[in-house]
Regions:
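Transmembrane helix-loop-helix hairpins at the membrane interface
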Residues: 13-22, 123-247
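Short helix-terminus and kink motifs of transmembrane alpha helices
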Residues: 24, 28-32, 103-108, 151, ...
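Juxtamembrane helix-loop-helix connectors linking adjacent transmembrane helices
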Residues: 39-44, 65-141, 159-164, 234-245
């Protein structure tokens, strides 16, 4: 593509690769131990988070279109060459299911996982009534985060490191690293898992030429995570929050 990366792309890449991850790491250092959110507060978080993700994606797509770049290069096209990527998707699903089953296969594992949810991600849903707004957030993350961190930043790094012997690896790993650090509030273990998840997604994009499968998998991972918290995490009731668990 001509005129890529432009100085505008450098600014966008700085924001998503450096500024946001550093901000996330700084927020992590403040700690969020055992904060309680009511259902209404969670729904507000999901809606505002969805809007923020939409803005992120809209900025990237707008810049892409302003410079008249092929939208398919951003990954917004149908996946092709099925034989080259289907196995990668299967491996991802198997690894994810294995990790989930192992984490929740014993009482100690469940207790540790629930304790971590309460400490690191207290905004996750604990009632069925919170699911519509939560699924909206999952959809927004699956679509707009993938547009930014896979479709856009992999392209950016690919062109930035053109001619480098490790071009493909760098193009996948750097956005994956930024994406995982941006989730630093979830703890070091989660950051490591998210990094490998993001690497899988990066290679899925490269081999399939499309973000579609990646978006679907991303949505499902987040959605299943919310369903699991509803199943296993008991909400700490606060005065004025009279909704029953699993309402």
């Amino acid at each position: 593509m001509d005129n890529f990366p432009h100085w505008v792309d450098h600014i966008i890449a700085f924001v998503f690769c450096i500024a946001i991850p550093l901000y996330a790491a700084r927020q992590k250092s403040k700690g969020t131990s055992f904060i309680h959110f009511s259902s209404d507060q969670k729904k507000q978080i999901y809606i505002s988070g969805s809007f923020s993700l939409f803005v992120m994606g809209a900025i990237v797509v707008s810049v892409w279109l302003i410079f008249k770049r092929p939208i398919a290069e951003l990954g917004l096209t149908q996946p092709g060459n099925f034989r080259s990527w289907w196995w990668l998707a299967i491996i991802f699903v198997v690894v994810y299911l294995f990790d989930t089953v192992v984490s929740l296969s014993s009482k100690k594992g469940i207790d540790d996982t629930v304790e971590n949810w309460k400490k690191r991600t207290p905004f996750l849903p604990t009632k069925n009534s919170e699911l519509p707004e939560y699924f909206l957030l999952c959809f927004s993350a699956g679509v707009f985060e993938e547009i930014v961190y896979r479709g856009y930043l992999i392209n950016y790094c690919w062109y930035l490191f053109d001619g480098n012997n490790y071009q493909q690896m760098i193009a996948v790993v750097l956005p994956a690293l930024a994406f995982s650090i941006a989730h630093f509030y979830q703890g070091a273990k989660a950051v490591l898992k998210i990094f490998f998840l993001a690497v899988f997604f990066g290679y899925l994009l490269i081999y399939s030429g499309s973000l579609l499968i990646v978006m679907i998998l991303h949505f499902l991972v987040d959605a299943v995570g919310g369903l699991l918290t509803i199943k296993y995490m008991k909400e700490v009731q606060q005065p004025g929050d009279e909704n029953n668990f699993l309402q």
